[in-house]
């Protein structure tokens, strides 16, 4: 496509009335703008959550040293007096930062970035829809999410500080924390619960919208087995959110009532104050165990809410850059559906230490092992898709390729935790932290970074810079492994995840003869300094990415085609960037999503929307989505 054609595409949709800036960019109902809003907001929350982690890691590595100036500047004089002692992080501050780090990174960062940002921008384009099914509901979903996030983060400015009961918010601690505050609505723990309810409400609005959009707004000829895998992943993720989040929302409301109205849904009898040993004035008879069940019923499907968008991005990038079809497409579709189903019957493997009997623990051990099967199918299909391909090592492809082994490490290190005998020793140690972070950080975030580099040209009409991309990728890969792998070895040595001083008291009592991988338990405390240095370096090497995002928007190399990657899915048939209504023609789909290197075609890609030539063999006509849905 010529530059002149590209420029005219930039003005696609000008025949529609011009909206005021606040309606076009702030309170927009356009799925693309909302996707970008989600991405920017989630990115800001991720940076804040990352900062909290840096402070925590300093406390772990150097518990007797004050925070350096580049960390302590954010603390006002009042905050320093309240949350630091001689400039050092206290145990209370560590608990607060730990609770908010987990909450922010999961609920405010990765989930909205993967599902809401990428899903909002890409899904309607890939199915040939002009927008989401409910545009105003889509806008409401974003603003409810932002309100929930701000409520949670503003709790840092409360007299009590933010929540300190861990990101899981277990009762009875979470039900009684900050109880000295007269107005409980001004307590950080209460603000956390209010924010949680808002975030879940936002997710429910979004999930209904995604499910309806994918079922009802597919283009002509886009049958179920012609959907890109990305869309399948968004559909399954939507159902996970729709079915798993309501129990946690109910739990959040009940815990809120425990704090504000004096009820005892989760508060047991017989609790005594640790300060003075006096019995607490509670009605009692509640069940803390019930809250754990409600939380983890969401908590494990939530892992796949985090994971599936990243796998979806990688599944789009690998075929495009190997120039061959996605291996085992149907197997991957069935696997992701099975993964969604099984994720609802494994939650109690987080609760082996709560005293469940052998029968029920055997059931959850079995289902936990079973759920690894569809995960292995997905990962294996992506790896085999590389075999025999003409691989183009673009920046998206490099990130996608790195995702595969990193996610593999995260998955394999989770297998021992499926068995209660192993979990008895590893539960709440740094092994669990290392396993989870291998899945979320070098796993999921690498997949999402790949997605940013892949779709950035479509969003902006410009490429991201390759040099800055490599400067971002290679140090990030190295730093993440130096940050998270030592956690696995520390965990096997018994290091607990909640020690704000890095485990000084533990190693004093540890036997010098005990070692893991040839390193004694006492020597393993030095790994804290390695991990902290890696975390700080990792933060520094995210700067090239931020610079790349900003500078490329204004000065990046312009794309010369609406389909710069020579891809086959429908989003590349739109103008660049897509205008109002997305398409300049009514899209029809004639084939599957990954038709690369077909011997009967003159180029190495055969887009879904390209009509067959007269001399080509006619393909079996597809039913319209409406007819297919009616038959189903």
Residue ranges with predicted function:
Residues 2-632:
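Membrane-embedded and interfacial regions of multi-pass energy-transducing membrane proteins
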């Amino acid at each position: 496509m010529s530059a002149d054609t590209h420029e005219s595409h930039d003005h696609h949709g000008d025949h529609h009335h011009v909206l005021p800036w606040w309606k076009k960019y702030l309170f927009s109902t356009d799925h693309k703008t909302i996707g970008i809003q989600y991405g920017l907001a989630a990115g800001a929350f991720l940076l804040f959550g990352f900062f909290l982690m840096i402070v925590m890691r300093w406390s772990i590595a150097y518990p007797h040293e004050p925070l350096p100036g580049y960390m302590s500047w954010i603390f006002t004089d009042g905050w320093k007096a309240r949350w630091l002692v001689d400039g050092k992080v206290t145990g209370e501050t560590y608990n607060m930062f730990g609770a908010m780090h987990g909450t922010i990174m999961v609920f405010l960062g990765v989930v909205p970035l993967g599902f809401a940002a990428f899903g909002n921008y890409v899904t309607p384009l890939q199915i040939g829809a002009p927008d989401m099914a409910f545009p105003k509901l889509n806008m409401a979903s974003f603003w409810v999410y932002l309100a929930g996030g701000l409520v949670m983060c503003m709790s840092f400015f409360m007299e009590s500080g933010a929540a300190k009961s861990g990101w899981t918010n277990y009762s009875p601690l979470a039900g009684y924390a900050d109880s000295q505050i007269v107005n409980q609505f001004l307590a950080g723990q209460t603000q956390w619960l209010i924010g949680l309810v808002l975030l879940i409400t936002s997710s429910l609005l979004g999930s209904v919208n995604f499910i309806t959009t994918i079922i009802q707004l597919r283009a002509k000829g886009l049958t179920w087995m012609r959907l890109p895998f990305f869309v399948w992943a968004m559909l399954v993720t939507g159902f996970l959110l729709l079915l798993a989040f309501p129990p946690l929302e109910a739990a959040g409301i009940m815990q809120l009532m425990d704090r504000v109205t004096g009820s005892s849904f989760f508060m047991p009898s017989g609790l005594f104050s640790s300060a003075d040993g006096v019995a607490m004035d509670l009605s009692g008879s509640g069940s803390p165990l019930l809250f754990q069940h409600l939380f983890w019923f969401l908590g494990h499907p939530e892992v796949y809410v985090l994971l599936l968008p990243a796998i979806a991005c990688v599944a789009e990038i690998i075929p495009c850059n190997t120039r061959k079809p996605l291996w085992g497409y149907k197997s991957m579709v069935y696997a992701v559906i099975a993964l969604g189903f099984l994720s609802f019957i494994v939650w109690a493997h987080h609760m082996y230490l709560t005293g469940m009997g052998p029968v029920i623990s055997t059931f959850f051990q079995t289902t936990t092992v079973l759920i690894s099967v569809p995960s292995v199918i997905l990962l294996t299909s992506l790896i085999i898709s590389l075999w025999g391909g003409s691989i183009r090592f673009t920046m998206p492809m490099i990130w996608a390729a790195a995702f595969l082994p990193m996610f593999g490490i995260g998955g394999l290190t989770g297998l021992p935790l499926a068995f209660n005998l192993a979990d008895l020793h590893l539960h709440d140690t740094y092994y669990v932290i290392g396993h989870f972070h291998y899945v979320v950080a070098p796993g999921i975030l690498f997949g999402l970074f790949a997605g940013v580099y892949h779709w950035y040209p479509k969003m902006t009409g410009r490429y991201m810079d390759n040099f800055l991309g490599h400067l971002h990728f290679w140090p990030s890969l190295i730093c993440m492994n130096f940050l998270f792998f030592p956690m696995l070895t520390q965990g096997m040595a018994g290091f607990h995840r909640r020690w704000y001083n890095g485990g000084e008291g533990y190693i004093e009592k540890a036997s010098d003869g005990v070692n893991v991988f040839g390193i004694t338990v006492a020597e393993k405390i030095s790994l804290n300094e390695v991990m902290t240095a890696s975390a700080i370096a990792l933060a520094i090497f995210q700067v090239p990415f931020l610079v790349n995002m900003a500078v490329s928007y204004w000065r990046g190399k312009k794309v010369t085609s609406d389909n710069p990657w020579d891809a086959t899915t429908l989003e590349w048939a739109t103008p660049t960037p897509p205008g109002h209504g997305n398409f300049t023609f009514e899209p029809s789909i004639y084939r599957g999503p990954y038709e690369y290197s077909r011997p009967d075609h003159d180029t190495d890609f055969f887009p879904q929307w390209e009509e067959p030539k007269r001399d080509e063999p006619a393909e079996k006509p597809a039913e319209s989505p409406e007819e297919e849905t009616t038959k189903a």
